Every structure is written in structure tokens, then in C-alpha cells.
Amino acid sequence: MSAVSQAGERFFATAPRGLEALLAAELGALGAKDAAIVPGGVAFGGDWRACYAANLWSRLASRVLWRVAEFGYAGDEDLYEAARGVDWPRYFDVGRTLRVNVSATKSPLKSLDFATLRVKDAVCDRFRDATGRRPDVDRRRPDIRVHVFLEAARGALYLDTSGEPLFKRGWRSGAGEAPLRENLAAGLVMLSEWKFDEPLLDPMCGAGTILVEAAAMARGRAPGMKRSFGFEKLKAFDSPAWEKMKRESRNPSPPRALRLFGSDR
């Protein structure tokens, strides 16, 4: 059985605050199951097709994370043991570069930097025990991102299926000063309840991000079509299924006359 056909995975899609309800509806339309809204994102279940579709089609998500473990903890060593207990070589090759990110709410840990170091050590130690090698760390452009979310006494470990944040659509060649992120721009368009046959004016358009996102929505263009994703570097990656999904997404709606206007003066 291919990895993509197995159901029952758990994911978490992060998003700008205020867009969680819209994101839950969007993910549901893309095949997500049991969506649960929390501040800053949406937890959901599904198979790998749902994960691929969320990365390819979500206009609102910032990242789609795959949950690989949950645990209780009281200190740094509990965190190390929880991360060491995950069979990381099952998920990615030792030759992949690695980055660990830790975020926390009401955590008793004194230093998140030290917690990050301990999780990194745990992942590398697990690989050393299994393969005799340790993955290299790359903080700028890693192949694999491990995310750790900590609450007061519980935590979860995730693998990032997105790679670069999803608001990086792949079309922007440069960024002006304080650019509006694409997923936030898409959320503003959705919240406006703009209809495609109506004019849309952005009187402070800057780089035109709101108008570009509006045009992409009207055309039915997949926002992730021109970029790569973190899941392509995981062992669970099903290339034929992914290529099929991309082929099926390359048929946007026929061109329509849009009235989009932008000004920055």
C-alpha cells in the first residue's frame, strides 16, 4: 500500500490570527477531516492527499505540519527523551539537513534555545544509533524542519510538510518595504466577500498583492503551483500521486473580464 493511500494522519495548519475559521472551511473543501480551530491555526485529519492538496491549494495557511508525536513533560530531559523516542530515520534520510524550531505557551522551561538544542541532539542521537551518522544542521535552508509546540505540561512534535512558508507563492521576484504577505492578502479578499463580477479597488496597493491574490482566486489558479514543498523530501512522499494532483490542477477557469484597480498615491 502506498503511503499516500493511508488515512488517519494528523496535521496542523498555521495561519494569521483572525483567519482560522476561513481556513477551516477551506481545508474542509480540500478533503480535511475533523477540523478543529485553535488560535493561530486549524488541526485536522486526513490522508496524504489532503496534505498535498492543502499545500497546493490553500490560500490562507502559512504552513502545514504533520504530527509525529505527543508527550507529557516537566523539564528539558523529558523533552529530550520524547524526541529521542521518535523513529526519525523512518521519516527522512540522514543525508537531509535539519532545523528545529520550538515555540511555547506557559511552558515551565527556562530557555527555549536550550530546549531547541536538546531536541536537535535527540534527533541526531537517534540517527547516530540507527545509522552511525548524524544529520547536518542548516538554519537557513534546511531540507527538514522539526517543529515543537509546548504547553504547560504537554507537547507535540511535527514535521513541516510545507518547507518555505506557504505565503511564498513563487511569483514574487522581490519584496518592497514591509510587504503584505500573500495569505493575509487572500484572507482580506475573502473577508470582503468580493464577487468576481464586481470591481475591486485597492487605493494603497503597494506591490499589488491583494489584487494579484484576487485575480488568482478568480482564475482558480493553485497558489502553490510554482513552488516546491517540504513533503517532497520525506520518505512518505508519493511522487506519482503528487504529479497527478499537479496535472489536475493545471486547468484554471477560463479567462474572465476582471475589473481590478490599484493605486499607491
Regions inferred by a protein language model and the residue ranges of each:
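Conserved S-adenosyl-L-methionine
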Residues: L180-R265
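Generic beta-structure capping elements
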Residues: D47, S103, E151, Y158-E164
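SAM-dependent Rossmann-like transferase core, predominantly class I methyltransferases
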Residues: L157-L191
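Short flexible coil/turn linkers enriched for glycine and charged/polar residues
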Residues: A7, E151-A153, G208
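Short, low-complexity, intrinsically disordered N-terminal peptides in bacterial proteins
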Residues: M1-G8, R247, N251
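Short glycine/proline-rich turn/loop motifs
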Residues: S103-T105, F167-R169, P252-S253
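Non-catalytic nucleic-acid substrate-recognition regions in nucleic-acid-modifying enzymes
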Residues: A3-I144
